[in-house]
Amino acid sequence: MFAVIKTGGKQYRVAANDVITIGKLEGDAGTAVTFGEVLLYADGDGATKVGAPTVAGVSVAGEIVAQTRGPKVIAFKKRRRQNSRRKRGHRQDFTVVRVTGISAA
C-alpha cells in the first residue's frame, strides 16, 4: 500500500514506515502531522485510486522526527578588474517525517 502526497509544492511517494525529508513544517520532534492532499492511493490488492485533483477520504499520518538544514549554497558574484565581489550563503530548512500510516475511508 502506498500513496502520493503533495506538500510544499512537491509530490512524494510514501508508504508506511517511510522516512522522508520535506520542506519545513512547523512543530517539534515527536509532533504528529497529517497530510490531506493525497493525489494517488494504491492498496495492496492492486486497486488504484487517482484523484482529480485529490482522492477523497484518504489521509496520510506521520510524525516529525527532526528539524534539519541542508548544505550551504554559496552565491558568488564578481566583476573583473574592479575589486568588486559579493558572497552570499544560504541554507534551506527541512523537516524529516516518518510516515506512520495511510488511512482510507
Curated annotation (Swiss-Prot):
GO terms for biological process, alphabetical: translation
Keywords in alphabetical order: Ribonucleoprotein, Ribosomal protein, RNA-binding, rRNA-binding
SUPFAM superfamilies in the record: L21p-like
Record Pfam families: Ribosomal_L21p
GO cellular component: a single term: ribosome
Domain of life where this protein originates: Bacteria
Keyword check for Mitochondrion: no
GO molecular function: rRNA binding; structural constituent of ribosome
Subunit description: Part of the 50S ribosomal subunit. Contacts protein L20.
Function per UniProt: This protein binds to 23S rRNA in the presence of protein L20.
Family label: Belongs to the bacterial ribosomal protein bL21 family.
Classification via PANTHER family: 50S RIBOSOMAL PROTEIN L21, LARGE RIBOSOMAL SUBUNIT PROTEIN BL21M
Protein name as it appears in the record: Large ribosomal subunit protein bL21
Species, as recorded: Methylobacterium sp. (strain 4-46)
Gene coding for it: rplU
